[in-house]
Design a protein with these regions (language model features):
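Polar/charged side chains located within well-ordered beta-strands of beta-rich proteins
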Residues: 35, 78, 84-86, 144, ...
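Surface-exposed extracellular loop regions of Gram-negative outer-membrane beta-barrel proteins
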Residues: 1-28, 33-78, 99-119, 143-154, 178-182
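Outer membrane beta-barrel strand-and-loop segments of large Gram-negative receptors
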Residues: 69, 73, 88, 92-174
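Membrane-spanning beta-strand positions in outer-membrane beta-barrel proteins
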Residues: 26, 30, 36-40, 77, ...
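Membrane-spanning beta-strands of outer-membrane beta-barrel proteins
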Residues: 18-24, 65, 75-77, 127-129, ...
Length: 182
């Protein structure tokens, strides 16, 4: 992707080119007729929008100015996962483990220079997470079914340029019981 901008009444000009290779790999192995094991790697990109890149300085409030950063790179999110699945008429089970990370997240930050608040953007964000998830469907009888779906994760967010960080556990569980009446 290529961006180019010229401004009327301004000597500023900027351009940005994004040539991102976005790989994706998946391997699958059938352990038995009803069981499989999958491993995958995926990368997603998030390209900065024009306002993130635009170097034009908004001085409508002289005590707080904002401008873009034409040197921003695409944010790259990487994900590795392993999934086991087992399916039969009575039980369906899916268990997944996933590790995801971003080392160049696009973040807005502000700083004071010469008594003026400056706001702009940079690739200063970092995040990583480890996720475990489980899906279970149990057909207890032809008229009775039980489902449970759960996920737990440890997440770690950091902003190197701002010396900010946050980490902790998160999760959710959903269950259902279905009974068909005569």
């Amino acid at each position: 992707m290529y961006l180019d901008a010229d401004y009327k009444n301004k000597d500023e000009k900027f351009d940005a080119q994004f040539d991102d290779l976005v790989p994706s790999l998946m391997f699958s192995y059938q352990l038995a007729p009803t069981q499989s094991l999958r491993a995958s790697y995926n990368m997603r990109i998030s390209r900065p929008g024009i306002w993130f890149l635009n170097p034009f300085t908004d001085t409508s409030n002289p005590t707080a100015i904002s401008y873009g950063n034409p040197d921003l790179e695409s944010e790259k999110a990487h994900s590795l996962s392993v999934t086991f699945g087992s399916f039969s008429q009575k039980f369906n089970v899916n268990v997944s483990a996933n590790y995801s990370f971003v080392n160049n997240g696009i973040e807005q930050y502000s700083f004071i220079k010469d008594g003026v608040m400056n706001s702009t953007y940079d690739n200063i964000g970092k995040s990583k997470s480890i996720n475990l998830s489980l899906f279970l469907n149990w057909n207890m009888s032809p008229k009775t079914r039980f489902n449970i779906n759960g996920r737990g994760a440890y997440v770690d967010y950091r902003s190197s340029g701002l010396d900010l960080k946050n980490h902790g556990w998160e999760g959710n569980v959903f269950g259902s019981f279905q009974q068909t009446l005569p």
